[in-house]
Amino acid sequence: RRQRQMCIRDRFAGYVDFRQDINSWLSLDAGVRIDHHSHVGTEWIPQGGLAFHLPRQAELKAMVSKGFRNPTIREMYMFPPQNPDLKAESLMNYELSFTGQLLGGAMSYGVNLYYINGDNIIMTDPALRKNVNSGEIENWGVETNLGYRINRHWQMNANYSWLHMENPVLAAPEHKLYAGTDFTQRRWSLSTGIQYVKGLHTSVTPGKEKQESFVLWNLRANYRLCSFADVFVKGENLLAQRYEINAGFPMPKATVMGGVNINF
């Protein structure tokens, strides 16, 4: 006869953070969080950074932070793909970013360089049909963004990211490029964008590695009926691309839907 045992685990956490303007061009951010788990133990999670306020609304930031997360009850015990042997994930993140504005604030731009070193990142492996720890990860890359407000009706935005992975991460792309535009006119609003994804890892299982590349076009239109309601129609993957984010699970082709939003 099988006997059931009740597993009781306690957890508490606390944090403190502060921001101090050292002078007109330099600010300091610092903080620390303590996370105690009766099964895993106590973990200190610090972060800190400097922000340099430059002329013409430009800003340079440097930051170092630690990330830490215990597996949840759902990930460990509830429904497939549960795994009771999951370990806590942790990582160190180093970032250097620069942001600025031009044309009287009509144009904004930014670039971000980062390096991540982590261990035991929790992910779902479709081939094994369960949650697993990925082992060690070491990633670095760059992210850029650009926004331009043409006039009170039109706005354009674009972003690009490049990611180098020493150890491939499931569902992470090497290149991602997006360009879109937004239009508003009285009660109407319209937004559309095209996204190009290259080198997305759909499977990282040894011997079954697989990558995908695809282009997505999405569109959304809204009409405000009154102060608390609007109707919308949106289309996703309008180019009807065949692609997967996780191997063995194809994403829908062209999808169109509409509805009413009511806000109270």
Specify the residue positions occupied by each region the protein language model found.
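Transmembrane beta-strands of outer-membrane beta-barrel pores
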Residues: 12, 32-38, 64-70, 77-79, ...
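Transmembrane beta-strands of outer-membrane beta-barrel proteins
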Residues: 28-30, 46, 60-62, 107-111, ...
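Outer-membrane beta-barrel "beta-signal"
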Residues: 51, 95-99, 147, 251-264
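C-terminal beta-signal and adjacent terminal beta-strands/loops
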Residues: 119, 124, 156, 196-203, ...
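Gram-negative outer-membrane beta-barrel transporters
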Residues: 21-25, 110-117, 133-202, 227-230, ...
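Membrane-embedded beta-barrel scaffold of Gram-negative outer-membrane proteins
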Residues: 53, 59-61, 88-140, 147-149, ...
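Short, small-residue-biased leader/transition segments that mark boundaries at the very start
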Residues: 3-8
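Residues that define the transmembrane beta-barrel architecture of outer-membrane proteins
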Residues: 10-12, 42-44, 90-94, 136-142, ...
